[in-house]
């Protein structure tokens, strides 16, 4: 049953990410029928990371794909994927990819997503 809940959440998250719509844990909890705290526990037990960590990593991966396109500014990409500013986006991006969005854009090589999304292996 928990696996079905998590799989349903993952499908919903992917749809929201593709639409660039906001993702709130309270909304996900309401959709699942579980309390926010219980949902967090189920998700972490099944995926090995918190729901917030998973969403942040997925947003970063989508932002990295957009950076490769080079037709949008870094600020527009940051805002599109839910980061409050370019500075916040740059700080979080650098923490996860060990490079800035601008340098990543110059290089254009996507990271190893399996390693980056390591919480998916559980």
Curated annotation (Swiss-Prot):
Q: InterPro entries this protein is in?
A: Homeodomain-like_sf (IPR009057), HTH_AraC (IPR018060), HTH_AraC-typ_CS (IPR018062), MarA-like (IPR050959), Tscrpt_reg_AraC-type_HTH (IPR020449)
PANTHER family associated with the record:
RIGHT ORIGIN-BINDING PROTEIN
* Originating gene: pqrA
Q: Which residues form a coiled coil?
A: none
The segment(s) forming the HTH araC/xylS-type domain are: 7-107
| Gene3D superfamilies in the record | Homeodomain-like
Q: What is this protein called?
A: Probable transcription factor PqrA
Task: Give an example GO molecular function.
Answer: DNA-binding transcription factor activity
SUPFAM superfamilies cross-referenced by the UniProt entry: Homeodomain-like
- DNA-binding region(s) in UniProt: 26-47, 74-97
Superkingdom of origin: Bacteria
Do you know which PROSITE patterns this protein is assigned to? HTH_ARAC_FAMILY_1, HTH_ARAC_FAMILY_2
From which organism does this entry originate? Proteus vulgaris
